[in-house]
Amino acid sequence: MGELSMQEMPLPALFEQGSKIHASAESSVDQDTVRKGCEILRQCEEMIGKLGLFSVNETKEDISTANLKYILVPYYLAELTEKVADNDRIKVLKASQAKLKEFISFCETMELVPEEEIETSTQGGANSSVDRRAKKIARFKRQRAAESKLLEIKERKERRGRSTKAAALSSPVETEEDDVLDDDGEEEREAWLTTISLGLCKAFDLLEMLKKEEEILSAVKEKQLQNGEKEFSQAILDERTKKVETWHRDAAARAHYTKPAAPITCATFAQDVIEGRAKVSQAHEHKHQPLIFGPASLVGRNPTTEREKIAAQVFQPHYRLPTMSIEEAGLTEMNMMNEWQERNVKLMEEANSSWYKDAPKSRPGEDDEEDDDDAAQDKARAWDDWKDDNPRGAGNKKLTPCG
């Protein structure tokens, strides 16, 4: 769409197209679409000013339902302007903040801003962290309430549309169209007022965020100007790019003349051990090397300075790197298998030996224990014999009771 056709478009069509671009910009759009949306919304602002839709002497009750949506034009333009990619980021931030302040100021004139926000702005902002936290919580609650209310209005409108359609299909009697139109008008006004309230909550949060970003960028720019490093970022990027390109070019050139040796893998070495061409204890060189990630490929495998150590830790994998190579793991398992086989052979030899012929050697304390057992056994036998010779009560038979 050219500039001429955009000027010929009516205001409702321009606003609808700009609001669609604003809604799609919340996810991801290209810069051409963002700039086009900014141009459309600027055209909307120009047409609103020419038509004189709003006046500073009016309030929200004086504005018609059809014109309420145009209050959101500066807010939409501020959010799209903030998403514009430009070398001068501070300039973009200032332009976006100007539109946000214009939107908030106009809403305050129309009595659309909550009293809590007005009190905070008149006091010069919340000073303590407790006040800032309370303000953010109250704003978050208003935002959630506005979102819930918009969803409720949408569902209510859909239900009424379905019921109206079903009633029209079931009965040929004409329904009261005036009541339906009145309900639609009230819902539309309520929806736009709620949308403006939601936009105010987001506008206050965005304005605070842009102010902090502008302060940080201004401080960085001032520091660079003081140190004479105006072109610091671009020069560093060019130097790093050149260094990386040189390293890859040299590596590609070396690859044509260097023939890598065939690596001794775990499988080939195990096959050599099985077939008798190598021993388990034989030392050999492992060709598997751990991967190098990120700037570690530039600083080398053994960083010396603290800067190189920090650079080598950038872009590391999210998982833990192996502590041993594949060959070392295979050798460890092979040693475990050899020990297990030797232990099984020893157990088989002990099982097949003449264990019944080999008298087990007695331990030093076993003889004393056997002697104690024999003495206790003799004592028990003697006591049994005495009880047989002297039954219970045998010595009291001749005694007479005392008279």
UniProtKB/Swiss-Prot annotation:
Query: Any idea what a deletion of this gene does?
Result: RNAi plants show severe growth retardation, the formation of spontaneous disease-like nectrotic lesions leading to premature cell death. The defective plants also display a strong reduction in protein synthesis, the induction of autophagy and nitrogen mobilization.
Q: Does the keyword Repressor apply?
A: no
A Gene Ontology biological process term: regulation of signal transduction
Keyword Nucleus carried by entry? yes
Gene3D superfamilies on file? TAP42-like family
Q: What is its main location?
A: cytoplasm
Q: What residue spans carry the Acidic residues bias annotation?
A: 174-184, 366-375
Query: What GO MF annotations does this protein's record show?
Result: protein phosphatase 2A binding
Which keywords, in A-to-Z order, does the entry hold? Answer: Cytoplasm, Nucleus
Q: What is one Pfam family matched by this protein?
A: TAP42
Q: Where in the cell is it found?
A: Cytoplasm; Nucleus
Region feature Disordered, mapped onto this chain: 158-184, 351-403
Q: Where is the composition biased (Basic and acidic residues)?
A: 376-391
Where is the chain membrane-spanning? none
Coiled-coil boundaries = none
GO CC field = cytoplasm; cytosol; nucleus
- Subunit arrangement? Interacts with NPP4 and NPP5, two catalytic subunits (subunit C) of PP2A.
Query: Which family would the database say this protein is a member of?
Result: Belongs to the IGBP1/TAP42 family.
PANTHER family recorded: IMMUNOGLOBULIN-BINDING PROTEIN 1 (PTHR10933), PP2A REGULATORY SUBUNIT TAP46 (PTHR10933:SF16)
Q: Which function does this protein serve?
A: Involved in the regulation of the TOR signaling pathway. Seems to act as a regulator of PP2A catalytic activity.
Q: What is this protein called?
A: PP2A regulatory subunit TAP46
Source species of the chain = Nicotiana benthamiana
